[in-house]
Amino acid sequence: MKLKHLHLVGASLALALFGTVAIAQSLNGKPPSDFGVEVGEPVTPVSIDIDLSKQPTAAEWKPGDPIREAAKRQYYPLDAVKPHAPADWVTSPDLLGDRQQLWDISRGAGSELKSPNARINIDNGNTGVSPGDPVIEVSQNYVLYGVNNSGGTIFKIYNKTGTLLAGPTTFKTLAPAGDPCATSVSDPIIHFDRLANRWFMLEMGGTSSANRLCVYVSKTENPVSGGWWFYGFATPAVPDYPHCTVWHNAYVCTTNESSAGAKVYAFDRANMLNGATARAAQRFTSV
């Protein structure tokens, strides 16, 4: 991955999204040397116009098949651990818990979303991979479920009454032929972007020489036949255990990149929703 290094000052996205870094900088005069912003390359999307309900389904694990287990991460020496942020770095408090409580109170009784069948049971069983890293997300009309599978990361699409509409489908079957994302690794992420009424999916893909964050953004709220945009973002290290969220001006994802530490990526949400070339992703080092 070709990366350009920029100083944190003047990087408006960094200041908008990562207050922790900004606070550390303002109090200490300048950030640590590895707190610069790295900029990748623009990514041109590939349009995916297929009906997922008519695609071949992924083979599911059955008793007797091998089970692949992820190796536990170790630090060397074995009694060493990654240090916390230095004590003299002042960081912003975590207000999420308080805000969640205020949100729960403000909703009031009877404001829950209703559906004909409020409970949907997804009995997935063993997938041949440990851990499975299951994820689930809902929209007004659909439920998407993703999990690690022996043949690659898979997802299923249900309606709100629990009827399976499509899948299991492997993420890699949506990637263009020959692209590194045609090799599925693990760690599915699925979000419903409620601000745009679209789906956002991501998995860790690629090969040892071509690491990727493989991103799929739906063209409509219909994940079955509404179409998708594919974006393959190169990363300089294995982007293990990604987690993402939706911000009003970016899709923001974190990764654990081994000796490189925890990283934060900001992706061009506006262009990705429109199927346009995504401006270069920005990569930050976490506190």
Specify the residue positions occupied by each region the protein language model found.
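Basic/polar N-terminal segments that are highly enriched at the extreme N-terminus
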Residues: 1-2, 23-27
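Bacterial N-terminal signal peptides that target proteins for export
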Residues: 2-10
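Bacterial N-terminal signal peptides
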Residues: 10-21
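C-terminal PAP-associated
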Residues: 25-287
